[in-house]
Swiss-Prot record:
Gene Ontology molecular function, alphabetical: chitin binding; chitinase activity; imaginal disc growth factor receptor binding
Protein name, UniProt field: Chitinase-like protein Idgf1
Glycosylation-annotated residues: N122, N218, N346
Family: Belongs to the glycosyl hydrolase 18 family. IDGF subfamily.
GH18 domain span: 22-439
GO BP annotation list: carbohydrate metabolic process; chitin catabolic process; chitin-based cuticle development; ecdysis, chitin-based cuticle; epithelium regeneration; imaginal disc development; regulation of stem cell division; wound healing
Keyword Acyltransferase: no
GO CC annotation: extracellular region
Organism listed in the record: Drosophila simulans (Fruit fly)
Primary location: secreted
């Protein structure tokens, strides 16, 4: 596969590389310690990866409803892990270590809109968030805070027949798009003001501040880019999970394509290029942007009606396929080593049913991504369609980031990479590929 990576270097044109991407922001989900078996990750297993990472983002803290204070989501775990993580600076003195808040880990069914409530809060309530953040960061030796606020998301693409597509286009002439947040403009201004106040407080305390744009959070709704970017040390674009089996149960497609594929009524903003260009065209310096890559894949369940070819868009899917046995964190989610073990070159061809290998289909254009599939059997069972970025395609995205003059790559996250070397014997293959092709 390496020859394809050199091919993409030519495709993107080395002459367009304005400046080498240097950042490798590595996210670490602390709950990986609570997993079972081979997915359980200890802090000492981070060492090999951290020789490549420039930043480590520890996830995740939460926002306490009511008081709007920053707080630990798992006190029993974090009271030990905070110190263990920040102590890594002794081995890696150049490493910047930040604490992330939100990140879709702050599940609060009673207060699902509490991050919007923080934006709408008065200055006194917002000061609770700022003060509690500074105390927690300073007490535990973090270099700064990463804002991965769980703001309202774009509505998922709906499946329409030809008549439905025509009617939707006709209806939009009169009604426009569905409004997710009618106060988005107000919230954009409030977010800008809040970030400015956080930055002013952090500046005197010598603390960093970064932003993570979570998947499907609409940047046009909440982020006033020209006013915001000076307040952040860097901005991480989680440019993946554009489609998932939970958001899009009836059709499977590339979850993180680099470019727009103008076919089958795809939406033009569901790709890396659109997201990156939005920030660049709104005057955010490229060196402040880090392109987010997922080290996991998303799997749909195929039906007999889904067909045999697997060429996306795949219709008549039935939601999420079973998730990884080791991770057990979400339906349809598999870590890279779990994906690797299921591919036909690594799994026995003699297996049948749910253990039968998946056939990998490589994107020779290197624009959209790779996928793997196992068609449903004669009873409509065991069908799987899986979209993922393997180490090679992660390297291609690193080259893309260089071609756009971006600051680097943000990897979500280390615990989903092959940190044990189960696939090929090499540990952290995705991290290594990204670092190699960033130069």
């Amino acid at each position: 596969m390496r020859f394809q990576l050199f091919y993409i270097l030519g495709l993107l044109s080395v002459t367009s590389l304005t400046q080498a991407a240097n950042n490798l922001v590595c996210y670490y989900d602390s709950t990986s310690y609570l997993r079972q078996g081979l997915a359980k990750m200890h802090t000492n297993e981070l060492d090999l990866a951290l020789q490549f990472c420039t930043h480590l983002v520890y996830g995740y803290a939460g926002l306490k409803s009511g008081t709007l204070e920053l707080f630990s989501l798992n006190v029993d775990l974090d009271m030990f892990y905070y110190k263990d993580i920040t102590a890594l600076r002794q081995k890696f003195p150049q490493l910047k270590i930040l604490l992330s808040v939100g990140g879709d880990r702050d599940v609060d069914e009673a207060h699902p809109n509490k991050y919007v409530e923080l934006l709408e809060a008065n200055r006194t309530a917002q000061q609770n968030f700022i003060d509690s953040s500074m105390i927690l960061l300073k007490r535990n030796g973090f270099d700064g805070l990463d804002l991965a606020f769980q703001l309202p998301r774009n509505k998922p693409r709906k499946v329409h027949g030809s008549l439905g597509t025509y009617w939707k286009s006709f209806k939009k002439l009169f009604t426009g798009d569905f409004v997710v947040d009618p106060l988005a403009e107000q919230h954009k201004s409030q977010f800008t003001d809040l970030v400015g106040n956080i930055k002013n407080a952090f500046r005197s305390a010598n603390l960093m501040l970064s932003l993570t744009v979570l998947p499907n959070v609409n940047s046009t709704w909440y982020f006033d880019v020209p006013k915001l970017h000076p307040q952040f040390d860097y901005i991480n674009l989680a440019a993946f999970d554009f489609l998932t089996p939970l958001r899009n149960p009836e059709e499977a497609d590339y979850t993180a394509p680099i470019f727009f594929q103008d076919e089958q009524n795809r939406l033009p903003h569901l790709n890396v290029e659109f997201q990156v260009n939005y920030w660049l065209q709104n005057h955010c310096p490229g060196q402040k942007l880090n392109l987010g890559i997922a080290s996991y894949g998303r799997a749909w369940k195929l039906s007999k009606e889904s067909g045999l070819s697997g060429a996306p868009i795949v219709h008549e899917t039935c939601g999420a396929a079973p998730g990884g046995i080791q991770i057990q964190s979400a339906e349809g989610l598999l870590s890279w080593p779990e994906i690797c073990s299921k591919l036909s070159q690594n799994a026995s061809a003699q297996y049948r049913g749910e253990l039968a290998p998946l056939r990998k289909v490589t994107d020779l254009t290197q624009k959209y991504g790779n996928y793997a599939l196992r068609p449903a059997d004669e009873n409509g069972d065991f069908g799987v369609w899986l979209s993922f970025d393997d180490p090679d395609f992660a390297g291609i995205k690193a080259v893309y980031a260089k071609s756009k003059g971006l600051g680097g790559i943000a990897l979500f996250d280390l615990s989903y990479d092959d940190f044990r070397g189960l696939c090929t014997g090499q540990k952290y293959p995705i991290v290594r590929s990204i670092k190699y092709f960033m130069g």
